[in-house]
Amino acid sequence: YGVERMRLLACGMLLQQGMYSILPMYYDYTSFLSSATYPAINMLLSEAFALKGRLTVGRSLVRPSDIEVVECLKKKSLREILSDDSLSDKLRVEIFKLQGKNLASILSAFVNPDELYRFSERIASRFQFDEITFDRFAEDFQLELGLDLIPILDRVYQTVGLAILDVRDIRVEQVVTEGYPRYLLSFKVRNISDVDGVITCVADNQTIEELRDVYKNAIPPDLDASLKVQDYVIAAGACKEVKFIMYGDCGYISTNLSANLPREYYIEVVREGISKTCDQCEGIFDIDSNLFHEPGVIIVDNASSQFQLVDSGQPKRLPFFAKEQKKVYKMVFDNVEWTEIITSTSYGIPVQSAFCKLAGEGNGKAIWTVNVQKAGKYEVFFYHQFLSMTGPPVSSVFTGSLLHYRICNEVLDENVVVEADLVPEGWVSLGKFDFSVGEVQVILDDRGGNIRMDAEDQNLNVIVSSTEQSLPKRQLIIADAVKLVRVKE
C-alpha cells in the first residue's frame, strides 16, 4: 500500500504542474479564468496576482534559463511560443512565470499593488460557484480599478522582442530631514528598443535603527521585513529620470522582463562620506535624450567586433563575429583560458559581460581596436571590477594584483602597469596620449602580480574559509571595456 500510495502522489504532483496541469478540470469553474482569445490566461494572471512573493531584496545570479528566455522572446511572441511544440515545457513555463511577473509590474505602475491583490480576492469570492470568463473579469477590472486590460494583454501576447534599458548615473544621497535616515535614489534610463519596458525600484521599508527600536534590539533572524516598491513604464524610445525615496539601507533597480542581463542593479547605502540633499521629490520625469550622448567619447566593449582575444599566443575569436552562434556564458572564474561571464559589475548594454582568466605568463591577450577619426589628445580608460571566488581562492583584487596594459599605434607604444587592488571599480584612467587619425590598440596581457599566501582580498563581500587558506591564491585577469575621451585643449 505504501509503495502504491507514493507512486500515486508522485503522479499527482506531475499532473498538477506545468503547461498541462489537470487541476482546472476539477475546479468546477470556481477559480479558473477562461478565454478563447488569450490562451493560458489563468496561468498568466495567477503569476501576476501572486504579488506577495514576487519581490525580495536578495541578490540573484543570471541563470542559464534567463538567457534561454531572452533568446526565445527576441524571436517569438508569447502567442507563438504557446503553439511551438519544439520548445520544452520547462522553458515555456519559465517564460510564463517571467511574463506574469512583468505584467504585475506593468499593472502596478498604474494601480496600487495592494488594490490589485484585493481585487483578485474579491473576484475569487464573488464568483465562487460560477464560471469566470475573461471578458467579465476585464469588465470588472476596468470598472473597479479604472484600467483597460485588453490593450495591455494584446501587447503581452503579440509583441516580438524585449525592451533594452540603458540605466546610468545611479546616485544615492542622504535626505536632510529629522528622524530616521532617508535616502534619495536617482538614475537616468533610456529605452533604446521599440518595445515598452518597465522599471521597478525596491528598497527596505525601514532602516536598521527603526527595526532595533521596534524590536528593542532583538530583531528576529527570520524577520520578513516590509518593502517599499514603485513601478514605472518606460515607453519605447523614452528618456526618463527616476527619483525614489529609500527608507532602508538596501534595495535594487529591476529591469524586469527585458533583454538586460543581469536584470538588477543593487543598491547598498554607504553612509560614510555620503552627499546630502534637501530634495524629497520622487517620481518619474522627462529628460533630454542628449544627456545620454557623450561627444568626443569612444567606447569599445568586449561584445564589439573591434575586440579580440588571444590564448597562448593564438587568436581566439571575435565574440559576436558569428551572429547566429549561440551565446554561452559561464559562472566559472578559474579557467586558464578566456571565459565569457555575466556579472552585475561588468560594463555592457544590454548584457553586462566580460572575459576573465587566471593570470599567466603574458601569452594570453585581450585587444581592443579603436578607430580615431579626429587627431588630438585623448584620455584612455579601462573598466575595472572586483571579482572573487573562494574555492579555489581567486580574485581580481588580491593585495599585489597588477594589470599590464599597452597602448599603441603607428607612432606610439607605451606600457602602463596598474595596481588593481588600489583603484576603484568603474572607469580607471591609463593616462593621456596624443593620437593621430587611424587605429589605436589597447592591449591587456595576462601577466598578473606576485600574489602571496597572506594576500588580502579587497573585495570585502568574500570571506575565505579556513579549509581554503592552504590553497595557493591566484589573480584573475578581467577584460571588459575601454574608453577614449577627447581632451579639450
Where are these regions (language model features)?
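Zinc-dependent metallopeptidase catalytic helix centered on the HExxH motif
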Residues: 1-77
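Amphipathic alpha-helical substructures
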Residues: 82-170
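A terminal-accessory region detector
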Residues: 141-198, 203-206, 430
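Terminal connector regions
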Residues: 247-284
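Extracytoplasmic
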Residues: 283-489
